[in-house]
Amino acid sequence: MDQFIKQDETGDLIETGMNVANHFLSTPIQGTNSLSKASILPGVAPVLIGNPEQKNIQHPTASHQGSKTKGRGSGVRSIIVSPSEAGNGGTQIPEPLFAQTGQGGIVTTVYQDPTIQPTGSYRSVELAKIGKERMINRFVEKPRTSTPVTEFKRGGGRERLLKARQSKRRA
């Protein structure tokens, strides 16, 4: 059974995602301080701790315990921010999806949440709008025509082949 997302639901989902992205883009990054326990909002920690994926990672099953694996910390990589980069919170990161040729048009951006002030590249906001439109149009059903559409079937034209064989046998 196919489940379709209605157009207004898709718009709401994308709008929520855009608000989350704008929230994180609007706050300056201050080195490794943003990754501390203090950055977790009160009341969110029980949800994170109760996450079933986290429980699965912390308590592997018996079938996985016997396998040879590297040390627990081997897959963890720390991010080191140089002091010159850490002091410049809110610096603009170049957009890798667009060619940096210096040729750009005028982009008008409409923000629905007045508390979120845009920072960063307006090109990325425009790219997100294009992606939103594509996602909305992707799941919209196309109108069906009144005339039936003939579908290609494997081995099609078999009736003509059988009639030709029967006419050869009669001759």
From Swiss-Prot:
Biased composition, class Basic and acidic residues, residue ranges: 151-162
Region feature (Disordered)? 54-98, 145-171
Record field: compositional bias (Polar residues): 54-68
Instruction: Indicate the family of this protein.
Output: Belongs to the Orthorubulavirus I protein family.
* Protein name according to UniProt: I
Report the source organism: Mumps virus genotype A (strain Jeryl-Lynn)
